[in-house]
């Protein structure tokens, strides 16, 4: 059985007012080619199909057209989709009666039975080969409060749900695949990336121990960097098909191919080249004169759909009312698309001066800020655990 793992498409994303439709179409065409070329049996999409809970009509057309075309071209292909935190779980599930006829299964809502217990069977999807069940998929969507068994905290509740699901199928003697849209302990996010910082103070980090060692592969979504989790080869984030922010400019794009056979589980990454990249100049914020020199080094040419998006970081050491005009003039004739000018003010530190923008300040977690203030106020003393736990609960309740 051959499986492809992808996630975090964010269809409909607007990148600093630039429409990314052509970039997403480029990825979906490539994905269809990989499915044909490698004769894929199962496609796993681990959440955040859309960039918003209320996607545009065009984004939905793109999504459903892809599902129709790829299942028509590959009649035996089975597709499993889970909702992410950016998706509307109910909206994603709504077309299930139609999608099931195309061999597409969507899981967004965690159902409960008449007794109030979680309907575990709804989250267990059989995988077929030539009409016979040859594996099981634990299709767990993004979990909100109340979506998991009662436990002391979010992490324990999520772990308990995966344990219950695995216990339902482990005696059947068939390979088990798990899916999830979450932040796993030991995973890495892109530096200064606001798009991924949805977990406050580690409160919703899930231990990789939630995924039993006997599970053949765990397909995760939510974090945008392709990676293994805690050095476990078979617990992975596929990453996004293209950078979703400038902080992700160095992330590798692609999907993960998993081959399950009698010999075991084989894992291979299939690299994808996005239609357009993103770039930041200079590497660190510099005064205007140096910024203009860096712009002069950019390649000349016409702006096309393959032209990279450009972020310019300028250090404002003194008032410069016309800096935007000067930058825009310098960019004329350059084969780039200006997306953002980040004007940064110098901030003094013991080690010198660093630049801080408003966007960078937004990446600081409230808990980290409080811990730092406490430490400086009380002569380097760490905040007591009881106070830290109380603060964590207040932050989580406030939802900031």
Where are the language model's segments positioned?
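Active-site neighborhood of phospho(di)ester-bond hydrolases with catalytic His/Asp-centered motifs
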Residues: 6-7, 43-47, 78-85, 105-110, ...
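Active-site neighborhood of divalent metal-dependent phosphoester/pyrophosphate hydrolases
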Residues: 40-58, 74-90, 183-203
């Amino acid at each position: 059985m051959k499986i492809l793992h992808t996630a975090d498409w964010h269809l409909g994303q607007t990148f600093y007012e630039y429409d990314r439709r052509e970039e997403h179409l480029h990825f979906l065409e490539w994905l269809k080619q990989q499915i044909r070329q490698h004769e894929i049996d199962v496609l796993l999409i681990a959440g955040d199909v859309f960039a918003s809970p209320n996607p545009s009509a065009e984004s939905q057309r793109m999504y459903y057209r892809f599902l129709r075309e790829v299942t028509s071209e590959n009649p035996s292909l089975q597709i499993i989709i889970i909702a992410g935190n950016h998706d509307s779980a109910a909206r994603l599930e709504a077309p299930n009666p139609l999608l099931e006829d195309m061999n597409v299964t969507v899981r967004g809502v965690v159902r409960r039975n008449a007794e109030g217990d979680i309907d575990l069977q709804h989250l267990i999807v059989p995988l077929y080969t030539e009409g016979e069940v040859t594996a099981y998929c634990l299709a767990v969507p993004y979990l909100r409060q109340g979506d998991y068994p009662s436990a002391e905290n979010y992490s324990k509740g999520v772990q308990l749900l995966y344990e219950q699901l695995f216990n339902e199928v482990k005696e059947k003697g068939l390979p088990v695949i798990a899916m999830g849209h979450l932040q796993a302990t030991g995973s890495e996010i892109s530096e200064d990336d606001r798009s991924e910082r949805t977990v406050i103070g580690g409160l919703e980090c899930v231990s990789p121990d939630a995924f039993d060692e006997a599970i053949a592969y765990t397909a995760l979504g939510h974090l945008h960097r392709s990676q293994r989790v805690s050095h476990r080869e078979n617990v992975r984030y596929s990453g996004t098909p293209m950078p979703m922010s400038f902080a992700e400019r160095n992330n590798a794009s692609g999907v993960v191919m998993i081959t399950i056979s009698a010999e075991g589980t084989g894992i291979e990454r299939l690299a994808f080249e996005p239609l357009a990249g993103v770039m930041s100049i200079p590497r660190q914020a510099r005064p205007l004169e140096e910024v203009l020199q860096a712009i002069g080094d950019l390649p000349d040419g016409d702006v096309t759909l393959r032209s990279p998006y450009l972020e310019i970081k300028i250090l404002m050491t003194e008032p410069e009312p016309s800096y935007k005009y000067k930058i825009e003039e310098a960019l004329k004739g350059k084969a780039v698309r200006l997306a953002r000018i980040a004007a940064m003010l110098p901030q003094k530190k013991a080690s010198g001066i660093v630049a801080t923008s408003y966007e960078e300040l937004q990446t600081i977690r409230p808990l980290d800020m409080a811990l730092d203030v406490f430490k400086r106020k009380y002569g380097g003393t760490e905040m007591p655990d009881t106070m830290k736990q109380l603060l964590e609960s207040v932050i989580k309740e406030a939802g900031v």
